[in-house]
Regions:
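Sec-dependent signal peptide hydrophobic core
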Residues: 11-16, 168
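Intrinsic disorder/low-complexity segments, especially N-terminal tails and targeting/processing regions
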Residues: 18-19, 27
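Bacterial N-terminal signal peptides that target proteins for export
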Residues: 1-12, 21-22
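Helix-centric, low-specificity signal for extended rod-like, repetitive segments
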Residues: 1-3, 15-16, 244-245
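Phosphate/dinucleotide-binding and metal-coordinating scaffold of catalytic cores
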Residues: 24-273
């Protein structure tokens, strides 16, 4: 199964994304900061400009921040919606949650798994009386929906696939009910980022699409095996409920078991890289 030729998710937004959209910024002169430096900038830099983000249905804002030395844009998402029932295009969802807190939890989990280079840094911050998640505005060229529409092929299919395998494992772990092709951004040298987790961490204890689990990075599998509930609880702070944490660990168990079974059947070299 080659992820280069398969849809990233069954849910694909109908809107056509233009390459000149405000979401896409040029990578030239992009500052090189550590994760901790990025967090501190997002937490402390002054907001000097704002405008509604050009995409999405969760009322996000594109903010311009400066600390006096560095000026950079950030994404601010304050949504925190809880409903007993929500009617969506895909059907009715009970105990519906759409919350910026899941962005923070997803980044914390990505850090634990060693794949935080594939997820933008998210911090919790208040702006204009609203608390939300603030993330580094990424230097992307296009999203995965645009790549599919334009039928663009990555120059290094193996490197691309290895990134996509990680994203697929992460998605099965976090149970994002709104994952779609616009949530995968593509930057310089076909670098991939996964963004927007506000509808993740559903309570199902089984991976939604186990067939997406085709191959796995060796280090990622070891990190998955080592993940423990106490550390996850501590890292995600107050962002996840006890039931959401239990569901993550249950899905982790299923994912690890599936890869172990695949290794037993096919051999390690066919499954891990």
């Amino acid at each position: 199964m080659n992820p280069l030729h398969l849809p990233y998710r069954k849910l694909i937004l109908a809107a056509v994304v233009c390459l000149t959209s405000q979401r896409f910024v040029v990578a030239a002169d992009e500052p090189t900061l550590t994760g901790e430096q990025t967090k501190q900038f997002l937490l402390a830099a002054k907001v000097i400009g704002s405008r509604p983000a050009s995409k999405g249905v969760t009322h996000t804002w594109r903010l311009t921040l400066t600390d006096g030395t560095l000026t950079h844009d950030a994404d601010f998402q304050p949504i925190d919606e809880h409903k007993s029932e929500m009617k969506l295009a895909s059907g009715t969802e009970l105990n519906f949650v759409d919350s910026y807190k899941y962005n923070l939890a997803a980044y914390a989990l990505a850090e634990l798994l060693g794949i935080d280079d594939m997820v933008p840094v998210y911090v919790e911050r208040k702006w204009k009386g609203q608390t939300g998640s603030m993330s580094w505005w990424l230097p992307s060229k296009m999203d995965e929906a645009t790549r599919h529409k334009q039928k663009l092929t990555p120059p290094d299919p193996d490197a691309w696939n290895n990134q996509m395998y990680k994203i697929r494992v992460f998605d099965q772990l976090i149970a994002d009910s709104d994952a779609n092709l616009t949530n995968v951004l593509i930057g310089e040298n076909w670098k991939i980022w996964r963004i927007d987790f506000s509808r993740a961490f559903r309570l199902n204890k089984e991976p939604k699409d186990p067939k997406d689990l085709v191959r796995c990075d060796r280090q990622l599998l070891e990190k998955l095996k080592a993940l423990d509930a106490n550390t996850l609880t501590e890292k995600t702070n107050h962002y996840l409920t006890k039931e959401e944490l239990k569901a993550v660990m249950a899905r982790r168990d299923k994912i690890v078991a599936q890869f172990q079974n695949m290794i037993a059947e096919k051999g390690e070299n066919e499954v891990l890289y």
